[in-house]
Amino acid sequence: MFKKYDSKNSIVLKSILSLGIIYGGTFGIYPKADASTQNSSSVQDKQLQKVEEVPNNSEKALVKKLYDRYSKDTINGKSNKSRNWVYSERPLNENQVRIHLEGTYTVAGRVYTPKRNITLNKEVVTLKELDHIIRFAHISYGLYMGEHLPKGNIVINTKDGGKYTLESHKELQKDRENVKINTADIKNVTFKLVKSVNDIEQV
């Protein structure tokens, strides 16, 4: 269902070009120059390609761990077999609720507002289940793709003003997994996430 977990230089450069992101100057045609100027330009070109520091091994391992966990399309007997965990405009059944995920991804100063929602049965679920389903929906748009940890939070908002915050850079805490939430009481899910430009393939 998902792309193999990988981050190749060609994908990185393609992603940068597709987003129109430029670091340290603008792309253009260099004027004719002597050898010393050409060498200087070559160094600048290499610097432009290195848009961020290479992530350390521990960060890469954590991103992979998060991807491996949240990319699974099943959790406690619930599954995405009917594609209810990704965007849908299908009419709802009487026992279903559609929860809208509203927010932004910020990439190198550019803000994206992807359109998404999830469709759940009206029932009491655990925070572990809800956390998994919501992050699964975000992975379908690129969360945890690449080698850098995202920054920012995902917030589950209830109709009575309650909030449950999910920190995108780490797993849900064990002591919160069994918190019970009625899906019919959820108002929406909001998010404000910042992704590494190196890891963006789709938003």
UniProtKB/Swiss-Prot annotation:
Localization (cell): Secreted
InterPro entries: SuperAg_toxin_C, Toxin_b-grasp_Staph/Strep
Annotated Gene Ontology cellular component terms: extracellular region
Highest taxon of the lineage: Bacteria
Function per UniProt: Plays a role in the inhibition of the host innate immune system. Inhibits phagocytosis and killing by human neutrophils by interacting with multiple neutrophil surface glycoproteins in a sialic acid-dependent manner.
Similarity field: Belongs to the staphylococcal/streptococcal toxin family.
Protein name (Swiss-Prot/TrEMBL): Enterotoxin-like toxin X
UniProt organism field: Staphylococcus aureus (strain Newman)
